[in-house]
Amino acid sequence: MGKVAAKMKVMPQSPEVDLDELQDRLENSLPEGAKISRVDREDVAFGLIALFPTVIIPDEAGGTDTVEDAFSGVDGVESVDVDEVGRI
């Protein structure tokens, strides 16, 4: 079975959220078999910075749903969207 790289957009609840701590919480929330290969940061507006983790997951039914659900439940996360997906 192959693997998929999914670049996710994670918006913090406010500019006051510590992004390093948020990144650690995201890594700890990952479902089994998933791992973060890199995390980019991008200024959005008014001091708000979005995290763009690239998550490597098995290519199976459900795709990124389990990662999206896990990230959505993390304290300090306002929203989670899939930015890009590709097989590796």
From Swiss-Prot:
The gene is ef1b. Promotes the exchange of GDP for GTP in EF-1-alpha/GDP, thus allowing the regeneration of EF-1-alpha/GTP that could then be used to form the ternary complex EF-1-alpha/GTP/AAtRNA. CDD domains: EF1B. It comes from the Archaea. Keywords: Elongation factor, Protein biosynthesis. One of its GO terms (molecular function) is translation elongation factor activity. InterPro entries: eEF-1beta-like_sf (IPR036219), EF1B_bsu/dsu_GNE (IPR014038), Transl_elong_EF1B/ribsomal_bS6 (IPR014717), Transl_elong_EF1B_B_arc (IPR004542). This is Elongation factor 1-beta. Belongs to the EF-1-beta/EF-1-delta family. Pfam families: EF1_GNE.
